[in-house]
Amino acid sequence: MSEARRVAHANAGVCTAADLTAAGLTRRAIAAAVERRELERLRRGVFADPGVPPMIKQAVRVGGRLACVSAARLHGLRVLREPAELHVSVDAHATRLRHPDDRLRLLHPSGTSSGVRLHWTRGGGGRGPLVSLEECLVQMFSCLPGLDVLCALDAARERVDWMPERPQLLDDAAFARLLQRLSPAFRQLAHRSITGSQAVGETVARERLRATGVPVRAQVPLPGGYWADLLIGERLILDIEGEGPHTAPGAFDRDRARAGWLKAIGYAHVSFSHRQVLDDWESIDGVVRMLMRRRVHVWGDERSIGR
């Protein structure tokens, strides 16, 4: 790896001319690195490793940091809907912003005509080419519908008891700090997030059921060491397939074995695809309500000795 690329890597893929000269590179050496495509010039005095994600390059070219829902996936968050605009955090006093695809074109302060959504922030959202995880979430609260926010926040807080090797992106202390930055209404929304959701479909289904008064819990432990994606009432298991753990190698056979065991000890089980949850919720809602009218969600004579 060349010295120029090493400097870029040490700065999260994006560095300044000052970073490069501090490492001993002359102006001529910097120009040669650009010529050899070891570096890509984004703005005057700002360079990137060519392998940096395109959205980061665009945000830096604008004059800020990748922000909000545009930064969410790079932080490891789940996104309900892909953004139609490039979200960029810029300093409240920033001037001479540039077009995301052309460093020579000025950007109108609204940004909308160029497909950019500007987040004016004192300090521009921190250091590095994208805002911090906490700043990303704060921006999402003020910018996106509540369901979109919960999908991302569930992902940030996800803590899988049977997968301790998977790090929790936003631990309890960080969540408490996040709450302090939110308005009362947004704090109320944040408290609806959970640590057990493992997929967008689970979050969406949980919230849509909750909104209609259906008694639902997520990631509930079951007999035999199994878990329910969602448990309606006492015994109706609702699984969302095609996303999350249901797509892992061997998941099909494991899911069939699990379904057989749980049926044998008295649980009722229905499963729907991720696509159905997002695009055909009315059908799912109809099935759930018919089952609840039949009292399938509560224990009766089928209560098993495994309970």
Cite the ranges covered by each PLM segment:
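Short gly/ser-rich loop at a beta-strand->alpha-helix junction or flexible surface loop bordering the NTP-binding
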Residues: M1-P184, L189, R293-R307
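Surface segments flanking catalytic/ligand-binding clefts of nucleic-acid enzymes
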Residues: R157-R307
